[in-house]
Amino acid sequence: MEWPKRARTADWENGVLTLDTEKRLEAPELTAEMMERLAGYALVGFHVKGYPITDELLSPFAGHKRMVNFGVEDGALTDACFPVFSHMPKLRYLLLDGNADIRGSGLPALQNCKIDLLTLNRTGLDDAGLLCAASLPRLFHIQLDHTSVTYEGLLATAGNARIEPVAHVQ
């Protein structure tokens, strides 16, 4: 597998790692070494869909200076993943759909982040986790379809005029 010298985006799905939407590398799994190599690039976007990424595999990305858009969908992340994102000064979009073990208790780690959009669809997010999300000062949109958030939980965040929770009737 030949890696390019530079990359701005990385996307892994179905065993294929795509760098900058054009360089395709066969990668049936994402190893710790691959994650370290990817974290070495000046990426602005990183997305993985359908691979059991763990909190530990994310650690090389801690403090990534240019990351704007980060997504792990249908992975194996927990609330312990949030400190990794807390030191990404340009992070605006955090997509964590389908990580069932995320409850929201780790969200206070993002208190100083500039995240505009947080997607937590199909996670274990509950009312307490939603309150943690609502306390993030720069968060404007949160998606929470197919979570444990109740109507009462939504009402508890109603006083926060800045945040716009998005949930569809289920």
Tell what function each PLM region has.
Residues 4-8, 12-36, 41-170:
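Concave beta-strand-loop units of leucine-rich repeat
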